Amino acid sequence: MVIKNVEFIKSATRPAHYPAGDFPEIAFAGRSNVGKSSLINVLVNRKSLVRTSSTPGRTQLINFFDVNGEFTLVDLPGYGFARVPLAVKKEWGPMMETYLSKRSNLRGVILILDIRRTPVAEDVQMLHWLRAYSVKPIIVVTKCDKVSKNERAKQAAVIAQTIGIQMAELNFFSALSKEGKDQIWQRIEGVLYGAETEAVGAES
């Protein structure tokens, strides 16, 4: 994917405020501090398209970006940060389920996991929603430069078992080395333009 132009469109919290039009959308989801901002910035060749917050999880907004005038990149709010107020945590579930169930031009969701962490309940819930609403997931495991090859293999097995997928469905990524960037774009293009014949992580 050659990135020619990326522009912020708007932020929203409810369907009435989502951008108009029928451009296909690819959304990015993951717990706070999972490396979502770094992944997006590397994929679109920008240093600060998505800024890393000093107070993770406090901003509960869905952010929409136009990419090449061809599709929309959607940055979903992070989840799972312990110090977020309870009221904010309660908003996350309904906001996510509404977007996933009602956004007809949503083609797929990049579910981002940290190679050093066991997936949390919200990760499992997100994957459940994607399956329930027939949204194709692409599982990306970040921060792979922070562990050894042996530790990566062990952690990958734990992650796959926890969320109920095959290890081969994991896409490994490092913001430092850019490992996985091309593979992830191939997966995204497949979902956007129909090359993918079946949902990643679909239950057999």
Swiss-Prot record:
Q: Which GO terms describe its cellular component?
A: cytosol
Q: Could you say which residues bind Mg(2+) here?
A: S37, T59
Give the GO molecular function terms.
Answer: GTP binding; metal ion binding
The EngB-type G domain extends over 22-194
Q: Which residues form a coiled coil?
A: none
Which Gene Ontology terms describe the biological processes this protein takes part in? division septum assembly
Q: Which UniProt keywords apply?
A: Cell cycle, Cell division, GTP-binding, Magnesium, Metal-binding, Nucleotide-binding, Septation
**One Pfam annotation, family name?**
MMR_HSR1
Concerning Gene3D superfamilies, the annotation shows: P-loop containing nucleotide triphosphate hydrolases
Binding residues annotated for GTP, in chain numbering: 30-37, 57-61, 75-78, 142-145, 173-175
Listed cofactors: Mg(2+)
Report the NCBIfam families cross-referenced here: GTPase_YsxC, small_GTP
Q: What is the role of this chain?
A: Necessary for normal cell division and for the maintenance of normal septation.
Q: Which PANTHER family match?
A: ENGB-TYPE G DOMAIN-CONTAINING PROTEIN, MSS1/TRME-RELATED GTP-BINDING PROTEIN
HAMAP family under this entry? GTPase_EngB
Q: Family assignment?
A: Belongs to the TRAFAC class TrmE-Era-EngA-EngB-Septin-like GTPase superfamily. EngB GTPase family.
Question: This protein is called what?
Answer: Probable GTP-binding protein EngB
Query: Encoded by which gene?
Result: engB
